[in-house]
Amino acid sequence: MDLGIDGKVFLITGGTKGLGLAAAHALVGEGARVVVSSRNQAAVDEAAAALGGPENVLGLAADNADALAAEQMVASALRHFGRLDGVLISVGGPPTGPITTITDEQWRDSFESVFLGALRLARAAAPVLPSDGSIGFVLSLSVKSPWPNISVSNGLRPGLAMAAKTLADELGPRGIRVNGFVVGSIATDRLKSLESANDDPARARAERTAEIPLRRYGTPEEFGRLAAVILSPIASYVTGTMIHIDGGALRTL
């Protein structure tokens, strides 16, 4: 199936590893060009090389918590490629731990990067996106049900999901679509880190997969393919939707 994105340009934050990098690979594989960002310059350089070099990718070292980063990333995309057709906003997981131990500073820092950083980028990109443009927010099952020991994510991501839904209403008349990805257990470094916090990581994995109807974790590539489809014109009538990719783990509709 031709996704109709040959030559289009997509900006992906958190695009140097995990879900963001998988989405970048899927988009480039369909002929798109990508702008990938990360706070780490070495990670940016490595991802850019893996994605095919300057003809296909622009790598940017940027921090979503920086109030100027969103405008700078959009400007860089336009300067390098001359256009911007879509954005995938993926932000690294905030600190783990129970609410009773998370400090005010941790809450503020996480709000800046996870919540405000995401909305700043959507706000900066919206005016320059074409009528068939698309914005995707990478969220998690904590949008629908709290996960143990990730209280900050449980607190922030549901609000971001509702903001995405609102943005879909606002941008819909221009033809710009906005969707969220409600991501379950995907085999990323972040998930491995959460497992390692347990006394017995192997047991934690066995217990978690036993609760997933498909009895396994998803792969970043499975997410990347879905993200590419939803960001593309193939999904031209899909907006304001929270799309689950969780192996059936969520026990509600």
Go through each PLM region and give its residues.
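Rossmann-fold cofactor-recognition segment
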Residues: 53-67
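Alpha-helical segment proximal to the catalytic Tyr-Lys
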Residues: 127, 169-173, 236
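Catalytic loop of short-chain dehydrogenase/reductase
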Residues: 136-160, 164-173, 185-186
